[in-house]
Amino acid sequence: RRDEHGFLIGKEKDWVYIDWADMDKDGPLCAEQMLYAACFRVMAEISKQLGKDGNVYRQEYEKLTAAIEKFFWDEEKGAYIDSFTSGKRNVTRHANIFAILFDIADKQKQEKILTNVLENDEIPAITTPYFNFFELDVLCQMGKLTEVLDKIRSYWGGMLDLGAVTFWEEYDPSVPKEEQSAMYGDPSGKTGCHASAASPV
């Protein structure tokens, strides 16, 4: 379902998963809209490669990205917010990473995101190897190769330092070693070998 702005909206009991993160999911979720916009752009490119007219997809992409800019960009924070309906104006890394990864943010906004989000320790860190991959990708695009190598050594290396022989579904370095296996309300609920966790290998 879409609302009057073209944003995807869920039903009351829908589960919207972007990552295991504390996002403000009141109303349309910014990261989800960015994924949706990226789909339109890809469909336009596929149409072009097939010799078809992909104009309808390009138009949807333009309309959706314009709405994203209007409702989710917060100039004061220099970042995209999770939700505009709750009034919280909460910033997480996820939508801002997608904004750079999918080239939704212009170069000026990308630099603001780098400073205000990606290099800002006050913005909660990503705790899944799966989504850390996207952050590393964006940092590489922005020329932060030393930081990327440091992150691989500290994050994936941190799991190895704790005795991991495979990479976990989730790893939060701030959690005590004896609690690292806990997830889903189960003291041993975390997947100890997760395919999406192996991205730098």
Task: Give residue spans per PLM region.
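Active-site core of glycosidic bond-cleaving carbohydrate-active enzymes
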Residues: 1-201
